[in-house]
């Protein structure tokens, strides 16, 4: 039943609360990073760009969270960003504090606008898939599939997702959720995508 509840839920705050025990902090941090990336105008302010890059390194264990201590309070970040604390600015805080990504993500989502909440819902599904329907990707980890997944992860260019679907089918994948996710032309893919992560063995 919980899997169906996840599929129906439209409130990102409720999706966050539904995440099972032991969920991936790495994935949650990538969710936050992508939310910030989508809401801050480009080019990012220098502070935002620096913090965002650091947060992504922390997510993949390429940096230590202590390296982000130079921004430590909500008030300081609000002053740095120069705007109110809705949506993207709240999420930027999550990146800088980093000690409890789950609590800080809740704090931020509670302050998101309705449109930001809708986008957060979409991103949570892109990154976590349906965490109550576990899929074993091991049988489909051919050299071709893994190479495609790794290339997209490293480059952030997910244009090869339909090609990945073909490679997965060649490897024997007949899971409609996986194949449809790869081939959906309306789906925006980001680093942390549940299919790409599954193939790369990332949690």
Where are the regions that the model predicts?
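Structured binding/interaction patches within domain cores
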Residues: 1-203
């Amino acid at each position: 039943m919980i899997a169906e509840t996840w599929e129906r839920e439209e409130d990102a705050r409720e999706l966050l609360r539904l995440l099972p025990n032991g969920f991936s902090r790495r994935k949650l941090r990538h969710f936050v990073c992508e939310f910030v990336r989508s809401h801050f105008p480009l080019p990012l302010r220098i502070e935002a760009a620096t913090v965002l890059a650091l947060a992504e390194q922390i997510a993949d264990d390429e940096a230590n969270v202590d390296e982000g201590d130079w921004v430590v309070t909500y008030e300081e970040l609000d002053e740095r960003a120069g705007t109110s604390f809705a949506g993207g600015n709240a999420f930027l805080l999550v990146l800088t504090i980093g000690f409890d990504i789950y609590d800080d993500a809740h704090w931020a989502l509670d302050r998101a606008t309705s449109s930001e909440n809708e986008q957060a819902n979409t991103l949570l599904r892109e990154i976590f898939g349906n965490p109550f329907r576990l899929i074993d990707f091991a049988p489909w980890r051919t050299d071709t599939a893994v190479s495609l997944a790794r290339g997209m992860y490293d480059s952030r260019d997910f244009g090869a997702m339909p090609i990945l679907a073909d490679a997965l089918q060649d490897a024997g994948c007949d899971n409609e959720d996986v194949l449809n996710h790869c081939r959906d032309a309306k789906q925006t893919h980001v680093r942390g995508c549940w299919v790409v992560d599954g193939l790369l063995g990332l949690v």
